[in-house]
Curated annotation (Swiss-Prot):
<dbReference type="InterPro" id="IPR020003">
    <property type="entry name" value="ATPase_a/bsu_AS"/>
</dbReference>
<dbReference type="GO" id="GO:0016887">
    <property type="term" value="F:ATP hydrolysis activity"/>
</dbReference>
<keyword id="KW-0139">CF(1)</keyword>
<keyword id="KW-0067">ATP-binding</keyword>
<dbReference type="Pfam" id="PF02874">
    <property type="entry name" value="ATP-synt_ab_N"/>
</dbReference>
<comment type="function">
    <text>Produces ATP from ADP in the presence of a proton gradient across the membrane. The catalytic sites are hosted primarily by the beta subunits.</text>
</comment>
<dbReference type="InterPro" id="IPR036121">
    <property type="entry name" value="ATPase_F1/V1/A1_a/bsu_N_sf"/>
</dbReference>
<comment type="subunit">
    <text>F-type ATPases have 2 components, CF(1) - the catalytic core - and CF(0) - the membrane proton channel. CF(1) has five subunits: alpha(3), beta(3), gamma(1), delta(1), epsilon(1). CF(0) has four main subunits: a(1), b(1), b'(1) and c(9-12).</text>
</comment>
<dbReference type="InterPro" id="IPR000194">
    <property type="entry name" value="ATPase_F1/V1/A1_a/bsu_nucl-bd"/>
</dbReference>
<dbReference type="InterPro" id="IPR003593">
    <property type="entry name" value="AAA+_ATPase"/>
</dbReference>
<keyword id="KW-0375">Hydrogen ion transport</keyword>
<keyword id="KW-0150">Chloroplast</keyword>
<keyword id="KW-0793">Thylakoid</keyword>
<feature type="binding site">
    <location>
        <begin position="170"/>
        <end position="177"/>
    </location>
    <ligand>
        <name>ATP</name>
    </ligand>
</feature>
<keyword id="KW-0547">Nucleotide-binding</keyword>
<dbReference type="GO" id="GO:0005524">
    <property type="term" value="F:ATP binding"/>
</dbReference>
<dbReference type="InterPro" id="IPR004100">
    <property type="entry name" value="ATPase_F1/V1/A1_a/bsu_N"/>
</dbReference>
């Protein structure tokens, strides 16, 4: 860790004497800068543009190419309006560095690690560069272990891997934000962990809504900011491509500190990973690289790998990443989502049909998948229960057309029993969330994996066939469902 040269006035003045360049060309967010012979900055160094009277501007750039003739090409992290040829540029001698540690919790940052929430400066001198190598193989924790979320449908049917990567697929209004906030809340309570949210190329309105909802639900503690459970890093879609391309690395750098130094389990959200690829494509075109398939950058796999390989478990702690994935034109073979899928351990698909039925979380039990759902990892009992639940729901799905046309009475006795159990399972997959308490008035429930398996086994065995299906709706464990059934009878 080191003090960030871009934020320390004394260091900037020292660097200024050594290595001052001049802008020779400006093309949108791309600057060409000439330096004295023998004083060329390294690739990824941060450059700070000086104003007319040698005052520092707010424009920081990152070196991307060495052009020859003592010139470099850099990409700006903010608007280049007002810049002119001949302006001075300071080579800071290091990559962009951002604040890390507990003081980042409850705050909102931009790509440079500067707070943008009007709550004053961040109380820390510890910073870390956003460009780092992935952990060495010897540091990795290779044990396959389940990351328990306390959410029944996730833990049973598409379990998350500790230190794994999960793709979150869902449109607007199906409960993606609430699911994200519940995961942030549960990891803090059950694992003593923290979360980092990276808003990559998202709408400013959505970022603002998320911040306000987090304050309302207590994920961000307004009374005592350091007691918050999440740090937010935003690079909105109105910002230059350089900022959108690097904001994911800023969020990841903050998460790495919690993993490596504080030895915590960290949850890293990236919304949306497609925007990271899109920003890289824009930068690639601006730098004059020849486009690859479908117009994407030729370095697509390398850029994705450099981000994804840093998201992993080490012997100190873990970073479990949940990434929202936008699929352009619903084409799963598009290079951007196809490259992302290669890195995912699990997919959580949110269904508009389930949301319309009022079943929350609206996770589709048949479309969601996980590489962890294997007998040798989760055990025979968990695997068998999950498979039987899926088989029952699949059979119910197949029978729905017959039910719609002919009605339940035309089904065989066995199929009627399957439908009754499937409807109970569907409702039991719903669950009241802690972060939704302020909206629903129902207390949130955290359900352990063993309790989840026991509940579904009882439904599948037929022991609860006599209970009404509404008793299983929005409850925690199976004991609450039986108690609710008794209340319904009285």
């Amino acid at each position: 860790m080191r003090i960030n040269p871009t934020t320390s006035g004394s260091e900037v003045s020292a660097v200024e004497k050594k290595n001052l360049g001049r802008i020779v060309k400006i093309i949108g967010p791309v600057l060409d800068v000439a330096f004295p012979p023998g004083k060329m900055p390294n690739i990824y160094n941060a450059l700070v543009v000086q104003g007319r009277d040698n005052e520092q501007t707010n424009v920081t750039c990152e070196v991307q190419q060495l052009l020859g003739n003592n010139r470099v090409r850099a990409v700006a992290m903010s608007d280049t309006d007002g810049l002119m040829r001949g302006m001075g540029v300071i080579d800071t001698g290091a990559p962009i560095s951002v604040p890390v540690g507990g003081s980042t919790l409850g705050r909102i940052f931009n790509v440079l690690g500067q707070p943008v929430d009007n709550l004053g400066p961040v109380d820390t001198n510890t910073t870390s560069p956003i460009h780092r190598s992935a952990p060495a193989f010897i540091q990795l924790d290779t044990k396959l272990s389940i990351f328990e979320t306390g959410i029944k449908v996730v833990d049973l049917l598409a379990p998350y891997r500790r230190g794994g990567k999960i793709g979150l697929f869902g449109g607007a209004g199906v409960g993606k934000t609430v699911l994200i906030m519940e995961l942030i809340n549960n990891i803090a309570k059950a694992h003593g962990g923290v979360s980092v949210f990276g808003g990559v190329g998202e709408r400013t309105r959505e970022g603002n809504d998320l911040y306000l909802e987090m304050k309302e639900s207590g994920v961000i503690n307004e009374e005592n900011i350091p007691e918050s459970k999440v740090a937010l890093v935003y690079g909105q879609m109105n910002e230059p491509p350089g900022a959108r391309m690097r904001v994911g690395l800023t969020a990841l750098t903050m998460a790495e500190y919690f993993r490596d130094v504080n030895e915590q389990d960290v949850l890293l959200f990236i919304d949306n990973i497609f925007r990271f690829v899109q920003a890289g494509s824009e930068v690639s075109a601006l730098l004059g690289r020849m486009p690859s398939a479908v117009g994407y950058q030729p370095t697509l796999s390398t850029e994705m790998g450099s981000l994804q390989e840093r998201i992993t478990s080490t012997k100190e702690g873990s970073i479990t990443s949940i990434q929202a994935v936008y699929v352009p034109a619903d084409d799963l073979t598009d290079p951007a989502p196809a490259t992302t899928f290669a890195h995912l351990d699990a997919t959580t698909v949110l269904s508009r049909g389930l949301a319309a039925k009022g079943i929350y979380p609206a996770v589709d039990p048949l479309d969601s998948t996980s590489t962890m759902l294997q007998p040798r990892i989760v055990g025979e009992e968990h695997y068998e229960t999950a498979q039987r639940v899926k088989q029952t729901l699949q059979r119910y799905k197949e029978l729905q057309d017959i039910i719609a046309i002919l009605g339940l009475d035309e089904l065989s006795e066995e199929d009627r029993l399957t439908v009754a159990r499937a409807r109970k399972i569907e409702r039991f997959l719903s669950q009241p969330f802690f972060v939704a308490e302020v909206f629903t008035g129902s207390p949130g429930k955290y359900v352990g994996l063993a309790e989840t398996i026991r509940g579904f086994q009882l439904i599948l065995s037929g022991e609860l066939d006599g209970l009404p299906e509404q008793a299983f709706y929005l409850v925690g464990n199976i004991d609450e469902a039986t108690a609710k059934a008794m209340n319904l009878k009285t």
